[in-house]
Amino acid sequence: MELLEERIKKDGVVLPGNVLKVNSFLNHQIDPQLMMTLGQEFARLFKDAGVTRVLTAEASGIAPGIMAAYCLGVPMVFARKKKPSTVTDAVYTAEVFSYTKQVTNTISVEAKFLDANDRILVIDDFLANGEAAKGLISLAEQAGAEVVGVGVVVEKAFQGGHDWLVNHGYHLEALASIKEFADGQVIFN
């Protein structure tokens, strides 16, 4: 998606450790117009998948996830990283390692928000090694739901997440696919 690639070139910062900082428009400050455009693109890409619910992870997946859900006309649920004291019902849980933060989180969704009849579209901000996507897929599978697609705003194709998802048969769409970082610059596929 050219608009997104241009925004990454303009405002993204490559940090040590193959980390791309895009906090000025995606995962700290949010550009709502850009998020709506991303949501429209996800809706276009998955329009024939029969999506009944979007599933994402807090916090950075929420903005693109809600816009995709809005454009598809379906609800969105986000996996929490900490179980609130108000949650007393059954939950689905999965362990997720964060490449950027180098920590493992237990993500959870209340069981009443996912069911076996759901056709889930997983949306997330980044795909690196695929840990968040795998965790979200696990939550959907625990509910007996079918994952009909995975949409990511930015993928680092040089890490293993892309290959894992494709090799396991998931329909993956990345709005910006990074081939590599070279001399502080982003090189797109």
Swiss-Prot record:
Keyword Secreted among record annotations: no
Domain of life: Bacteria
Predominant place of localization: cytoplasm
EC numbers, comma separated: 2.4.2.22
InterPro entries for this protein: PRibTrfase_dom (IPR000836), PRTase-like (IPR029057), Pur/Pyrimidine_PRTase (IPR050118), Xanthine_PRibTrfase (IPR010079)
Binding residues annotated for xanthine, in chain numbering: 20, 27, 156
Function according to Swiss-Prot or TrEMBL: Converts the preformed base xanthine, a product of nucleic acid breakdown, to xanthosine 5'-monophosphate (XMP), so it can be reused for RNA or DNA synthesis.
Protein name in UniProt: Xanthine phosphoribosyltransferase
Gene source species: Lactobacillus delbrueckii subsp. bulgaricus (strain ATCC 11842 / DSM 20081 / BCRC 10696 / JCM 1002 / NBRC 13953 / NCIMB 11778 / NCTC 12712 / WDCM 00102 / Lb 14)
